[in-house]
Amino acid sequence: MLTEASLSIWGWGSLGIVLFLITFGPFVIFYLAFYILCFVGGGLVVTLLYGKTNSEKYLEQCEHSFLPPTSSGVPKCLEEMKREARTIKIDRRLTGANIIDEPLQQVIQFSLRDYVQYWYYTLSDDESFLLEIRQTLQNALIQFATRSKEIDWQPYFTTRIVDDFGTHLRVFRKAQQRVTEKDDQVKGTAEDLVETFFEVEVEMEKDVCRDLVCTSPKDEEGFLRDLCEVLLYLLLPPGDFQSKIMRYFVREILARGILLPLINQLSDPDYINQYVIWMIRDSNCNYEAFMNIIKLSDNIGELEAVRDKAAEELQYLRSLDTAGDDINTIKNQINSLLFVKKVCDSRIQRLQSGKEINTVKLAANFGKLCTVPLDSILVDNVALQFFMDYMQQTGGQAHLFFWMTVEGYRVTAQQQLEVLSGRQRDGKQQTNQTKGLLRAAAVGIYEQYLSEKASPRVTVDDYLVAKLADTLNHEDPTPEIFDDIQRKVYELMLRDERFYPSFRQNALYVRMLAELDMLKDPSFRGSDDGDGESFNGSPTGSINLSLDDLSSVTSDDSVQLHAYISDTGVCNDHGKTYALYAITVHRRNLNTEEMWKTYRRYSDFHDFHMRITEQFENLSSILKLPGKKTFNNMDRDFLEKRKKDLNAYLQLLLTPEMMKASPALAHCVYDFLENKAYSKGKGDFARKMDTFVNPLRNSMRNVSNAVKSLPDSLAEGVTKMSDNVGRMSERLGQDIKQSFFKVPPLITKTDSDPEHCRVSAQLDDNVDDNIPLRVMLLLMDEVFDLKERNQWLRRNIKNLLQQLIRATYGDTINRKIVDHVDWMTSPEQVADSVKRFRDAFWPNGILAETVPCRDKAIRMRTRIAGKTKLFAIMPDELKHIIGAETTRKGILRVFEMFQHNQLNRRMVYVFLEGFLETLFPQYKFRELFNKLHSRSKQMQKYKQKLQSTQAPSLQKR
């Protein structure tokens, strides 16, 4: 029964559902749900509308007070106050100088307009708030200007800035060394260098590290806000500072509107590179410097940017439709670009493969090196320092020091005896003091190097030593008293296998060649003064005049030869740019006259001059070839000057007296002037020796003459002022004793590392007052890392600079520097700086738009251009003093230092901190900055490391 009943229920239920769906359709369920939702939603809407209406009625009732209305006096007063415009008088005087106040007022106006007014006027039309802000800014500027007038800025600009820059460079140099030492196999990234930089900074500064401010934008903004608030506290009246709203507005304008954009611009590497190029815009980039930069570049991005630009220029040149003379120019340009592209590709492949080639090691393994004679080494500062290092390693330093000491003794003795003979000619009273001092100096040299007590002792023949001792005891000393022994010592150093022969097989010799720029790849040469192949006798190489052999007529006195440089030009041959001189030659005899032109480079003149001065020694004192020039050697004015000098050289050479005095000279002259390609008789090495070493040799030989002439110039002036030559001789005699009684000692390392302190902590007291000497010593030490070099070289450089400055200018440079600082801080220059700031941020009175980021390729090419400019302006004289390789490394180090935004920010903040410490010396700004930087992570690590190293020592106690 139950089963039948359940079946009946299911049956009727199914039938009902089917009928329901047939009647209302299959979507009736969705409609039903929709109807229910609409019903519920409608009820809620009605409820909300009812509540809203009742709420509005209640609020309207609450707005009206139930108290009786007051009189109309208060509303009337409020209306009167609104109608009265409160006038605020603002004194527009800021610094007391109208030329400064006017642009400053414009800066204030533009700042308020672009940072405050554009949003303030949407809130209120009341001008009083804006006037209060303006008054607050003016009060701060007035206090700032007043304080600036009371400060002596000379120590800051001549001492503090130089110390800060030198210290920054030292930290960067040590960071570079530390990154290199960490792992030679894996090249450190820029992030590693920045992190290591701040590690070194905290080790050097001890109590401050600026890593957070320089690497975290959030912390940097907080630092600037705190700094601006401190400045406002010092500059604003107490009433204005207590107004938080006003103070915060001014703080934000200064921090985010002025200081932060300025710091961003000054620390941008691309901006610095463009500024460097602009600063030396007058110097022309030469081919050799450009190719050296590509060869030395380790940045693939730079090489790719140059390669892509070369490919773009190639495509453009190949698309040109040219004919005639232009086709040769286009072909030369295409060849040059192809060569640059090839060098870039080769360098990129080498960097990507990781197979970096050490030029010094490669040259050492190759075995075929230039031979530098010993006499050239002894007169060249750069070469001598390497030979000195080697002699110290082999125990032969006594021989070298003896040779150097005797050279110095000879020059000084000649000078002293010249003074003495001058007194005899003038009939003045004689004194034996000078001879006594010379005898004492000679005896001192004998005791130091040659006596049995000498240690180490110079080993020479005993009879020479005995002869010298007898001369010292019985005769007056002469400048040549040590010549025989010095000659023997020279031969010993030259022939003994321990010394010069072994030095040529040592790695120091290869490094010496690198510093002398004698390991250079010849494929990268080419300039006006280059040593490449001589240019053909004619520009096209196809013009050949049918001339008889000029040398066949040398014996004919009736033949007259005249030549002059008629024109100059700049040529480009396979990427090498050089100057070409067109020489017009006239040959006359009894019956005929012939004329032709030949073309020569400066290197041809140089080679020709070397050949004839070697063959005819008397010409070396008569003929003077115009010297080389490092940069601007393609400048039109320079080429005209050189043309004039070379013309004078030719006219002197072709004088009849000169030709008759040296009949064989005519053969060389005719060969040089003949219309054919000049065959150089000297090799590349010989010309380098003539350029780099021989002038120094000649200068060493002429030191005696230069010193002899001293009493007629500088010393004579001193004598006229003091009228006491005896005192001057006594002082010079004391210098002899101090110079020659002892072997030049090496500077020993102290227990405290001098590298872990600021650069100013290592200067001598007598250097501190000499501003130019101080600046040059700091820059030479830190840029070129002279502390790692031979200390004899460093002392020589210091003495050279010191004597040059003091003897030539005295206090003149100091006065000029002080006057220049006064000029920089004068109202005119301050006004000019404010105007430049105004024009940079608001050109034509309109806020400057954000400069779009320059393309990476453009920035990379700017880097190449900047380095090329720096290389091009480096004088050869600097390379002669400290070495070519050291000069290149120093330039690249300084340039690389400015390629890191974080490190540039650090330098800007260091300069800012020094400026504020100078401006407010009575306040403890140093402690304030230490506190603001106290959250540095590197500082915390350093303190933990310091505590961990000090803990064991404390436990032992």
From Swiss-Prot:
Keywords: Endosome, Lipid-binding, Membrane, Protein transport, Signal transduction inhibitor, Transport. Residues 373-511 form the RGS domain. The keyword Thylakoid does not apply. One of its GO terms (molecular function) is phosphatidylinositol-3-phosphate binding. The keyword Disulfide bond does not apply. GO terms for biological process: intracellular protein transport; negative regulation of signal transduction. Disruption phenotype: Embryonic lethal. After 8.5 dpc, embryos are smaller, show failure of neural tube closure and abnormal cephalic vascularization. None survive after 14.5 dpc. Visceral yolk sac endoderm cells contain large autophagic vacuoles. The gene is Snx13. This is Sorting nexin-13.
